[in-house]
A protein has these predicted regions:
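Disulfide-stabilized cysteine-rich extracellular repeat microdomains
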Residues: 29, 34-37, 41, 237, ...
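Short, acidic, Ser/Thr-enriched surface-loop or helix-capping motifs
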Residues: 26, 33, 92, 366-367
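Positively charged n-region of N-terminal signal peptides that target proteins for export
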Residues: 1-5, 69, 406-407
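C-terminal outer-membrane/trafficking sorting elements
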Residues: 334-407
């Protein structure tokens, strides 16, 4: 790494701590500010449409009302919503049921969502269309029991909660802001995302992963999503979040969307980048109810439940990859390549790294020792760095330098 480059990197790291100019730091945003060092959450993006990859119709009658989706060790897990039994279904990547597990000691009032951390799977029994429920709960299951293929029954623990700011339980049905179908888990807390029928926003409530009695969920922040949120997914490696939802186009016809959230300050997920992806209509997708992410990736699965009205649309499974829409590179220095700024993704990465809007020589340096790890020409096919050790690196593409993290 040349002396000028090292000096530049040192200077910018110092400047980050002293001057920290705030602005939109995402090169993909309409209002990208190349001089900004600190992301202030102001980025906005052009309207983005994406066609999900169709995997299969979920042909089993057991999955017609599936709601919620989680990915554990390459297996998908799903549940059914209100009025159904207390079963969890394991699916393969084609959507076929490979295992049925009975959750003992719990009820299914209105199961709506699944999430997980490293030790437990959580079921959200918090569907509340009428706004009148006073028995909202989270069901907690030990993952080590669930993943024991020799058993078909696991014990569930029911944890009750209420919203700290709800005092009126009269509804009316589908016209209030205290429904919920989405949540995510970290090591020690759960974040619930409301389904606001009344104002089309989402409110985030925080509760711990374990408590006694009835816990009072604390409101922490809100965001205008322009629709109804039906599920959420979280990747603990990259801290990326996806919110699945739909908006009514009138006369009962609706289209689905996914909000991508990343590069936010811990605890305040709506103060970072927020990008909406339009994914299609109910006639193609069905009623989208489940989403999950692959580890360290903005790719994953979406599931839908059956629509039975004037027409019947079966439950379905889809795949997506939104890596091209998310820039996680920490920019050390950058210049435009023609009219477009370049960026690297994914970041953090496990193996292959891609560079958008760039062709030419790239150099990868160890951030600690400054030693050259890789040098070669980039020709749009991605570079495989799976053989290098985990750590922090500097990737130099032309005159642009990015800080990259290898997991």
């Amino acid at each position: 790494l040349g002396q000028k480059t090292i000096s530049l990197i040192i200077f910018i790291f110092i400047a980050k701590g002293i001057f920290s100019q705030a602005g939109c730091t995402d090169p993909l945003a309409v209002n990208f500010d190349a001089s900004a060092i600190e992301n202030d959450g102001s980025c906005f993006y052009e309207t983005t449409a994406y066609t999900l990859g169709f995997v299969s119709d979920l042909s089993s009658d057991l999955l017609s009302e599936n709601s919620g989706l989680s990915l554990i060790n390459e297996s998908l897990w799903t549940i059914n919503d209100s009025g159904n039994n207390t079963m969890i279904y394991e699916l393969d990547s084609s959507g076929n049921i490979t295992r049925e597990v009975f959750v003992q000691g719990v009820n299914n009032v209105d199961w709506e969502a699944l999430t997980q951390n490293s030790t437990h799977l959580f079921i959200g029994d918090f569907g509340n269309n009428a706004g009148s429920r006073q028995d909202l709960s989270i069901i907690k299951i030990n993952k080590s029991e669930l993943l024991n293929n020799s058993i078909d029954t696991v014990l569930g623990q029911t944890l009750f909660f209420k919203y700290g700011d709800q005092f009126d339980f009269s509804g009316p049905t589908n016209a209030h802001n205290y429904d919920c179908e989405a949540f995510i888990a970290t090591a020690d807390s759960l974040s619930l995302f409301s389904k606001n029928w009344q104002n089309q926003e989402v409110r985030k409530y925080t509760i711990p992963c374990q408590w006694e009695g009835e816990y009072v969920a604390t409101f922490s922040e809100s965001f205008n999503v322009g629709g109804l949120i039906t599920d959420a997914a979280f990747d603990p490696i990259s801290n990326q979040i996806a919110l699945l939802g739909y908006n009514d186009l009138g006369t009962g016809i609706y289209s689905s969307f996914i909000w991508l959230l990343w590069d936010y300050n811990s605890g305040n997920i709506f103060n970072g980048n927020k990008r909406r992806i339009e994914i299609g209509s109910m006639f193609t997708l069905g009623q989208t109810e489940g989403i999950c992410l692959r580890p360290s990736s903005m790719s994953g699965y979406v599931s839908s439940e059956q629509i039975s009205s004037v027409i019947t649309i079966p439950p379905r499974l889809f795949v997506f990859n939104f890596e091209e829409f998310v820039s996680n590179s920490t920019v050390i220095s950058q210049e435009a390549q023609g009219e477009a700024y370049i960026y690297c993704y994914p970041n953090p990465f496990h193996s292959r790294v891609y560079i958008r809007n760039f062709k030419g020589r790239i150099d990868l340096y160890d951030a600690l020792g400054g030693s050259l790890i890789y040098q070669g020409d980039y020709l749009n096919q991605g570079v495989d760095f799976s053989g290098i050790s985990s750590g922090v690196y500097f990737l130099k593409a032309g005159h642009s330098i990015f800080q990259m993290i290898k997991n």
